[in-house]
């Protein structure tokens, strides 16, 4: 293989040591909190039939521009999952799960985007879906779960909750008419993407980051002016619930989310510390998605958080266990080291022994200079059933009887 192929594919990233530990910490914390809220962990394949994701909406950027699609050897249209929700809905329907049910998942997702800071083509998400409740209390619970995660990560004071309410279908239909009427007056001044969306999905223009679009949107009609009584009551209950939990929020009527299936409550937790990639957690209601994919009519709400973005914001130092290095001297000692290493590891002690041939004691000690404890034994120690235990931080060294070795090491590593 050519050398220039021995590298990461553009938009992907290797994870090593401390960075991987940080990722695992975030994912483990999320699953722990999910369990407190009654979520069941599930896992779906990273590949699905393409039609699973076309329900995201033919006007969404994910479907039209960003999906990794291919035909397998059987001629089936396959897609690397670009998000979790549709795959989880597929699981819900195909496994005929009983609702209400709360499902937690995590792992890599794939989108063909322009790579930049905290925006890769393969990235990782933690994902929460709640199926079976149309109550605004469910929305409050899910948002509080987000806030719980951010608080545990010590980010709650650096993140802002932005929330919007898209209303029911009656509200959306009425608002679309007036929004299109307003935007048509500025059609030629809109960005190219927004000119296309004006025809196929005008609500998505509200989410535009284009400077020319933002200027036009300043005087656009607000969806809140078109709420019917049901929408007003629902949104008020959500906001009252957040107030009751002392969760601060900002109402932002331009939040519509990038996927076509969202309705009613939509929200984002944003930060000013990641440049243009300011959304850390995002989600909302999708009461019509399950039915549109062939299931029963099922109200639902969910959200996903970007692990890379959370990782970029938090300080985390993996507490590494104290390392014990074996330095056997001579063939008999090496034979004993095999047994000793196995027995210590079975007792939960971290043993590092990589040089099975051995060199000089001086050389081995030099290589072990950054470790915690060294065990030295040769013919003399084997005959007396002892091991030299050296603390590499203090330089202290003592002979320890083999029968006392485990207790001695456990005392040192606590």
Curated annotation (Swiss-Prot):
Its EC number is 6.1.1.21. Keywords: Aminoacyl-tRNA synthetase, ATP-binding, Cytoplasm, Ligase, Nucleotide-binding, Protein biosynthesis. It comes from the Bacteria. Its main location: cytoplasm. GO terms for molecular function: ATP binding; histidine-tRNA ligase activity. InterPro entries: aa-tRNA-synth_II (IPR006195), aa-tRNA-synth_II/BPL/LPL (IPR045864), Anticodon-bd (IPR004154), Anticodon-bd_dom_sf (IPR036621), His-tRNA-ligase (IPR015807), HisRS-like_core (IPR041715), HisRS/HisZ (IPR004516). It is found in: Cytoplasm. It catalyses: tRNA(His) + L-histidine + ATP = L-histidyl-tRNA(His) + AMP + diphosphate + H(+). It is an enzyme of class 6 (ligase). Transmembrane segments: none annotated. GO terms for biological process: histidyl-tRNA aminoacylation. SUPFAM superfamilies: Class II aaRS ABD-related, Class II aaRS and biotin synthetases. GO terms for cellular component: cytoplasm. Belongs to the class-II aminoacyl-tRNA synthetase family. Homodimer. This is Histidine--tRNA ligase.
